[in-house]
């Protein structure tokens, strides 16, 4: 028996924990690159369970599960606390993940290049935000590795997704919180693909889970009273459409100056819905 994160209704922002026997296979890790997962402090719990084969990139800055079939992450997990936010600024150095590329080259594959989104009108959408790693230049640069990106519409990336990112940092900087965050794609509808080979799969939605702790707390202190946020945001155009084949709308300039900064709240959902749509199971005992 082990604790599994589960909730049937977290619109209130609270996660609940129940005991559950594992019913699906453990993560199918093809390759671990980097730190042992037990030493990665960005992971609040054990690796999420998934039926997808994954390559784990375990770094000081985050832990990333990469899917070589979609050529995108299955999820990325990171910790956000006050020491992660500094004055290094945004490097803007989108680049090939050379660690991932070296491994993929062994089977005649390659990692996504910084230019592979060119001409698609999709943003290179950070999962770990640049602004969550501004303590040093090198830490910020790791957020610009293309393995950390998903094809996101400009409206999703620069408006509703960004507003939740800003809210998260406000929790840390203004309320003294520590966050454990997991974000990734949902592929419940065929949305096409981009890239020179048309093999970078476009997600229909993006999910994010945020566990909100006090600065002096550790993952071991997470219980039924621990507040959290779960959202599922559609890969949506500014006009509200999810028809991403509409290149005219997809390529339109987007601004968030007049947008409601709390617009992300309309996308709150339940942990169980995130699990259902993403195919991931979140287990609270750490490896």
Write out the residue ranges for each language-model feature.
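Domain-level detector for secreted/extracellular nuclease and nuclease-toxin modules, and
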Residues: 5-9, 13-287
């Amino acid at each position: 028996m082990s604790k599994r994160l589960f909730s049937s209704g977290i619109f209130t922002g609270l996660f609940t924990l129940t005991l559950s026997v594992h019913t699906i296979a453990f993560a199918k890790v093809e390759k671990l690159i980097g730190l042992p997962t037990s030493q990665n402090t960005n992971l609040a719990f054990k690796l999420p369970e998934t039926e997808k084969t994954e390559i784990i990139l375990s770094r000081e800055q985050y832990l990333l599960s990469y899917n070589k079939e979609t050529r995108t992450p299955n999820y990325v997990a990171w910790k956000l606390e006050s020491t992660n936010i500094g004055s290094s600024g945004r490097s803007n150095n989108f680049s090939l993940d050379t660690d991932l590329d070296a491994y993929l080259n062994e089977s005649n594959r390659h990692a996504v290049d910084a230019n592979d989104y060119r001409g698609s009108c999709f943003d290179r959408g950070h999962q770990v935000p640049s602004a969550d790693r501004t303590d040093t230049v090198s830490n910020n640069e790791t957020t610009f590795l293309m393995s950390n990106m998903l094809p996101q519409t400009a409206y999703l990336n620069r408006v509703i997704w960004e507003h939740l990112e800003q809210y998260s940092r406000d929790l840390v900087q203004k309320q003294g919180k520590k966050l454990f965050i997991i974000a990734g794609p949902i592929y419940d509808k065929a949305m096409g693909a981009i890239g020179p080979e048309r093999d970078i799969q476009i997600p229909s939605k993006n999910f994010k889970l945020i566990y909100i702790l006090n600065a002096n707390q550790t993952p071991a202190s997470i219980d039924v009273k621990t507040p959290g946020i779960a959202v599922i945001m559609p890969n949506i155009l500014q006009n509200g459409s999810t028809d991403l084949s509409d290149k005219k709308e997809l390529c339109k300039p987007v601004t968030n100056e007049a947008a409601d900064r709390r617009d992300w709240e309309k996308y709150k959902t339940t942990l169980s819905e995130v699990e259902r749509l993403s195919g991931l199971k979140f287990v609270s005992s750490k490896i």
